[in-house]
Amino acid sequence: MEAMSPQQDALGAQPGRSSSLTGMSRIAGGPGTKKKMKTLAERRRSAPSLILDKALQKRPSTRDSHSASIDTCAFLSSFMCSSRTLLIDGPVELKRGLQRQERHLFLFNDLFVSAKIKYNNNFKIKNKVKLADMWTASCVDEVGEGNTNALKSFVLGWPTVNFVATFSSPEQKDKWLSLLQRYIALEKEKDYPKSIPLKIFAKDIGNCAYFKTISVMNSDTASEVINMSLQMLGITGSERDYQLWVNSGKEAAPYPLIGHEYPYGIKMSHLRDTALLTQGSKDSASPSQLQEPFLMEQLPREMQCQFILKPTRLATAQQLSDSSHKTYKRRRSIINWAFWRGSSTHLDNLPVSPTSPMPGQLFGVSLPDICENDNLPKPILDMLSFLNQKGPLTKGIFRQSANMKSCRELKEKLNSGIEVHLDCESIFVIASVLKDFLRNIPESIFSSDLYDHWVCVMDQGNDEEKINTIQRLLDQLPRANVVFLRYLFGVLHNIEQHSLSNQMTAFNLAVCIAPSILWPPASSSPELENEFTKKVSLLIQFLIENCCRIFGEEITSLLGELSERSDREHTPDTSCFQLNDSSYDSLENELNEDADAPCSDLVKRLGQGSRSMDSVLTLSDYDLEPPEAEGLLTLSNFDLDQSKEEHIRTKQPLETKPVSVFVAYRKVSLGEHTRAPDGPGTPSCLPATASDARKVFRRHRRSSEPSIDYLDAKLSYLREFYQKKLRKSSCDAVLSRKDEDYLKQTQPQKKGDQRCFKQSSVTGTDVSKRNTANENIKKKSLSGHEGIQETPFTKSKPVAISVASYMSSQDHSWEQPFEADACRFSPPHIADAQKSSRAHRRCSEPSIDDQNYKLSYLRGVYSKKQSKTSCEAGLLHGEEDYLKRHKSLQMEGQKLINQSLVMGIEVGKSSSSTNQSTEKVLPPRLNLCPRASYSSLSSPGTSPSGSSVSSQDSAFSQISEHSVFTPTETSSPIDCTFRAQRKQEELSSDCDSPSLVSGMPGPSTGQASSHLAYLRKGTTEQLPQMHSVTLHPSTWLRSGLVTLKNWSLKKKTKAARPEDRKDCSLKEPLELPACAAGTPEADSLQESQEDIHLGVDEGAGQTACGLSSYACQDSEQHASSPFCLAGSRLTLGMKLHEGEESGGQYPCDNPWEGAPSGLETSEDAANTGVEPATVCNDGDRH
């Protein structure tokens, strides 16, 4: 670069030569300065204008122009082929709507290319179209906007767009137009097939077919296709009244065709773009080619090219919103919307809003024409009322933009007179439509003729003068305009009062709504329009802040009346409110049903139109529940969360657990907790489930809804009102109230029996503490104390209550010490009964028939048993039959014992196997009373192998402490006189075990040792022969060894039983329950086993003492009354010896006469503080 040719030096020395054209950087100032100046020059001038300069100016052939031509040749080389020639190329300005683009066009004999010029003389291809698919027209004003020189421009288009092409000169324009028309026609002659079927859909046209398929030639324009479609569809009118739209996958919205386009070229181009139509030869069969356009039906709907015929009026409105023109118009409205009406004259004939329809019944009509007797139309009043209710609670109201499609649909409905439910619309859509309605009022609502006067208002001195001037101007407006302004500024004032929440101050509202209220005339300049717009905004702000002084104070009350009236009209039948919430709806529906509810007036004030989120939260603070929920509130101690095991139990029939009625009553009656010594809610008196009830109760409430103390505030507030609701919707509460009165009457009798009740040996059953022996027995249901969960009850036992559970749930207020114990050890099966009562019911509503039957039956049982002894109050209707079965079973047990005396050693050897087999094979008659337990004991002196000891051990583990030994036919004459020292030792060591209560361990050892059995007294004939002896099984065994030998020898003389009795004993196996291991009885009996072996070795092993034990009543049977009888009795026939020293025998021929009866085993009276047991004759019971 340092050495330069003379020619380059001369060119560089020319002072007027532009460096951009020569490309030289050598000007005056040295090489570094010249290079720097070139860079600055390129920065000042944009790249497109620089290249356009080079393209339009004729320059001498220099190195730069040569390089540019090289770049063009390099670009064109990719399009050139043997049959394609370049006809012309040159720069052009393409305009579409408000958008202008600089392009460089290349026209070939069959192809049209549009490229974008880059700053480095390169081209970027933007469009490449076949000439057969192109069209030209002269309707420049319909395609482009703004000032367009028609002498240098024409319309150029291809699927599916139209542009206004402007050239540098009219000569260039004519040259391009002639070449395009000529070669487009030549290419169309090459099209094959010349015609294709085209499906035309009719939309918004009544009384015509939905679509028709017509045959379209490749040279038919859109206008010609409209004429053919009208004839095929049977529509009268000219093609000017209708417009053809095309919906293709290239553009998101349907595109309107002006009339000069070729529908044939649009559809064929679409097929080529989808690559479904291959290039066919002209010699192919015509029918196959005609079927190719039908491949369009195989495309997805979004890819199909559809042609739609619409009326011109609706098409015009659709064009403003959905066509490609919409984008550019919206862009302009956002930038300089304040100057629309005065910026250019060509926009005056178009609607101001891009979504406004053509003038109809509402929009675009002056207010005096649509207001009858100066009353606003109902749609306008509805929108104002809706905005007055929801606007103050909406952030950014009148500022945030709305969905344009929703706005257009709402406007079309309002403009056509269709009734609209505004509750289904967004509040932003309604605000946008209201502003659009204001913008479409001819000459504005403030009147454009008074524009100068309105602008000068803010130039007044003080506020009073401004107000007076405004009022004078308002008097000059039509009355309908003033009425509308009163409502409008009342709404704006209400929104401004809540500006802290919605962030819309008077200034913000004025900026958003001022352009829709007043705009400058068309003759104003942009500078004046900008200044006037600011003054109009200040004027609207002043009107909002002083609307009460300008329009009067009554505008506030007027809006209030509108709000209430709208609520009454829309609340009953509106079901599509957007803030739809299931909990909210159910709450308000319940309040609407209860016209006399305490909060019903609140619901009347908060109508359907005012269902904002704040109103939802306000109503949820009341937290009112349906009437059924009140029963759940009072039943707060129920454990509503059930485990899977408990849920399985609840599937039993309801009649198996009627105890839930009593438990429900105790929980419903909150007042009785108050009468308790410790007051309500004492932690030591409430079961474990009571603390979780409040948490479980509200499990269906929404997390957003606040919760209040419903036991204190809400119950005290609503209890009086919901008393009558309980009578018609909650059967539990009604039936429980009747039982409350009944139990109050029987409460003195319960208090009288309190002492006897405390002495009961059975205080409840604890399923979790049952031993292994009882679990085995439970499987066969003979002594199954847990049978309530596995076997349904019979008809004679509908009540499932143990004494402990009954006392803990109802009588905890009688005795505080016992109350604490009972509540602390609440039986689990009672909790199961509570849960099962709510298994198949919603809320607290039970099955009315079942519960009514249960309560009626329980009342009858109570009334019958109150007249009897208090300890016998729990017996049911079938007691006589039940005791007869016991008598017969007792006799059978005695007969089996007689057979065991004959089989002595054999029975002893098979005793272990018998214990196992009896659990599997049960006598059928024993299943009649599954809750009772039966056990038979062999004599302690008949089994050398110790089977009698194991039998006695298991028997004494099954029976309770209330055992009565009575004589039988085969009773052993064992002496029952014991030494005082041995008696004290045995009782002190054995009577402390809780296992003495067979199958029913108490909650604690203290409870197990604090009960006494009540025995009936015998007849006068037997009393002289009876005497009471405190007896324990282990003590009885040890003392009986003394007389065992003599008794067995004398028994040999008696005749043996027949052999057939032996067979009967084998057919009817005895139930020998297993004894719980590890109990004190087992230890003591084990010690006495050796002594028994010695006695057996000495004496005869064929004689035995028949021991028969059975439990006459189950704990579940006795639970129907407040008392529990002895669960089982042990009868023992014995013949007492007159003296241990003499060794004589006391003969007994009749076992029922003269045989003394042993008494039940019990604890030491000194330890338990319980009265000694009384003697009763067992025969009297039977």
From Swiss-Prot:
Protein name in UniProt: Rho GTPase-activating protein 20
Xref: CDD domains = PH_RARhoGAP, RA_RHG20, RhoGAP_ARHGAP20
Record PTM Phosphoserine, positions in chain: 46, 704, 730
Keyword list (alphabetical) reads: GTPase activation, Phosphoprotein
Give the PH domain ranges: 86-187
Keyword Phosphoprotein appears in the UniProt entry: yes
Q: What does this protein do?
A: GTPase activator for the Rho-type GTPases by converting them to an inactive GDP-bound state.
Q: Where is this region: Disordered?
A: 1-40, 744-791, 932-953, 981-1009, 1140-1182
